[in-house]
């Protein structure tokens, strides 16, 4: 699965990691609620871009 990066603060959403920062168990970013926000800065889902390692 792809990782996504917050363009405002640099937080990396990694669907392989399940924990308090991930909104659901399967982790696919496309399936995350539109109401979800970055756990570090509160940016909306629209402020994330595909992260290239």
Curated annotation (Swiss-Prot):
One GO MF term: electron transfer activity
Annotated binding of Fe cation, by residue: 6, 9, 38, 41
Free-text comment on the cofactor: Binds 1 Fe(3+) ion per subunit.
Biological process according to GO: alkane catabolic process
This protein's UniProt keywords: Electron transport, Iron, Metal-binding, Transport
Gene3D superfamilies, sorted: 2.20.28.10
Family matches, as PANTHER family: RUBREDOXIN, RUBREDOXIN-1-RELATED
Function: Rubredoxin is a small nonheme, iron protein lacking acid-labile sulfide. Its single Fe, chelated to 4 Cys, functions as an electron acceptor and may also stabilize the conformation of the molecule.
Name recorded for this polypeptide: Rubredoxin
UniProt organism field: Peptoniphilus asaccharolyticus
């Amino acid at each position: 699965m792809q990782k996504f990066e917050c363009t405002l603060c640099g937080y990396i959403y990694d669907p392989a990691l399940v924990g308090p920062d991930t909104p659901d168990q399967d982790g696919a970013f496309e399936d995350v609620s539109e109401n979800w926000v970055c756990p570090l800065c509160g940016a909306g889902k629209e402020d994330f871009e595909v992260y290239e390692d």
